[in-house]
């Protein structure tokens, strides 16, 4: 039996510049972190030749091509496993529409577990690259590359997407004391709305060339935020950058926010939040807000109608947490 654990992520700034329509023209960049909420992939060898898949549905098929779960199907094809396995996926949060990158975390976790099932160790770069190939090139999802890379590498990272299709991943060298402060000053509230990111990203992708100036401004915010995080001064300027980033992001598509989300955001700011953003593509999922410690009780009281979702920053990417492997055969 193999179990992989792959973290979910929070994207702070730069989202949208990881779409090919942007980075094929000029380099894109994001600043993201992984958090202590995960997706798990469990792979168990079966005596028979059937394929058993357990998620929100249960599938039992005798041919890989008959699998409806496209991420599992393509990950198995990519890794060369065709039969005789049972695969179960579990998640700490709603598996679709959370805005925390769960689909890409599942893809990365599947690849990691399937390779481990064969006794193979692969790099974070390979996991990220192959997850992008599956989700973007093969399945044609209108998404960017940031989720796959942050899930594979983990930690607090600046990720740059270059026109030559290379990707550069750098650690943000934040002091430990500030890292604790930065992490503890962020609150996450569930909007109680889930949505398919593709519904928003299709429109955003179509508008990319018309929104290049806004996207470039969002990319510049990556460097501003990194500069603040790596400075010696622990300050709350990060909240203002998140506020500015959210104002930019809303200009990319009318679907990114809604009257309900705007009201929720304003409630948090009125109670003391310095800034924030809806996670992922927008439209629902989770609202991230930056709140100084002394204002957090007031913000939680103002947001009492929404579920508070405590989290911590996680320095690790996808990893194998259990490996009891018998001899594998095809």
Protein language model features and the residues they cover:
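Flexible, acidic active-site loops/lids enriched in D/E/S/T/G that coordinate Mg2+ and/or position polar
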Residues: 66, 79-94
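Short pre-catalytic strand/loop immediately N-terminal to key active-site residues, enriched for Gly-Thr
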Residues: 93-98, 274
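Short, conserved acidic/polar surface loops in the N-terminal third of protein domains
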Residues: 64, 97-101
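C-terminal nucleotide
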Residues: 1-11, 18-24, 30-32, 36-81, ...
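Short secondary-structure capping/junction motifs at helix and strand boundaries
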Residues: 82-88, 120-127
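DPxDG-like acidic metal-binding loop motif
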Residues: 100-124, 155
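Glycine-rich active-site/cofactor-binding loop and its immediate structural neighborhood
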Residues: 284
């Amino acid at each position: 039996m193999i179990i992989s654990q792959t973290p979910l992520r929070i994207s702070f700034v730069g989202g949208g510049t990881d779409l090919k329509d942007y980075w094929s023209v000029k380099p894109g960049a994001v600043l993201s972190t992984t958090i202590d909420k995960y997706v798990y992939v469990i792979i168990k060898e079966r005596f028979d030749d059937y394929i058993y898949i357990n998620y929100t549905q249960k599938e039992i098929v005798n041919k890989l091509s008959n699998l409806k779960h496209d991420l599992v199907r393509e990950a198995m094809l990519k890794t060369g496993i065709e039969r005789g396995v049972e695969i179960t996926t579990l998640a700490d949060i709603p598996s679709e529409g959370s805005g925390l990158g769960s689909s890409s975390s599942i893809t990365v976790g599947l690849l990691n577990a399937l390779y481990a099932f064969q006794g193979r160790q692969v790099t974070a770069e390979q996991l990220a690259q192959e997850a992008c190939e599956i989700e973007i090139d093969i399945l044609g999802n209108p998404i960017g590359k940031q989720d796959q890379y942050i899930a594979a590498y983990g930690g607090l990272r600046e990720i740059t997407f270059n026109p030559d299709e290379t990707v550069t991943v750098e650690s943000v060298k934040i002091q430990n004391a500030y890292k604790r402060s930065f992490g503890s000053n962020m609150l996450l509230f569930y909007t109680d709305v889930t949505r398919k990111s593709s519904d928003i990203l299709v429109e955003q992708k179509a508008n990319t060339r018309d929104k290049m100036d806004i996207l470039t401004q969002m990319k510049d915010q990556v460097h501003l935020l990194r500069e603040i995080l790596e400075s010696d001064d622990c300050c709350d300027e990060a909240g203002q950058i998140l506020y500015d980033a959210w104002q930019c992001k809303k200009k990319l598509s009318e679907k990114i926010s809604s009257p309900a989300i705007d009201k929720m955001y304003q409630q948090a700011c009125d109670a003391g939040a310095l800034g924030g953003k809806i996670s992922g593509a927008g439209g629902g999922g989770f609202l991230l807000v930056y709140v100084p410690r002394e204002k957090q009780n007031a913000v939680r009281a103002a947001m009492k109608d929404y579920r508070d979702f405590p989290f911590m920053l996680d320095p690790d990417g996808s990893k194998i947490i259990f490996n009891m492997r018998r001899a594998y055969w095809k």
